[in-house]
Amino acid sequence: MHAALITVTIDPGKEDEARAMLDAQVVPMVRQAAGFVAAYWLEPHDGKALSIAVFDSEENAKAGAPPAGMRPPGSPVFVESVEFHNVMANA
């Protein structure tokens, strides 16, 4: 398994809009991605948020994660960084 560790910045005052977009668009899209295993979105802190999406292979993790430097059109979220890691263990 491989995980994508994603760091985003949320525009100030747009946290509710970002949360609505996460629930309505992002979660369903990631859930349908090839090789999807699990994903977790952590509550923002000081305008930054982290997510971890786990896939069955490195190829699917890279295909299912957004590119760093991306801001979807009209979105209050900017993708700061994306890292890929082999999952060593899980519980």
Predicted regions and their residues:
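Short S/T/G/P-rich N-terminal loop/turn motif that feeds into the first structured element of a domain
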Residues: 1-50, 56-68, 76-91
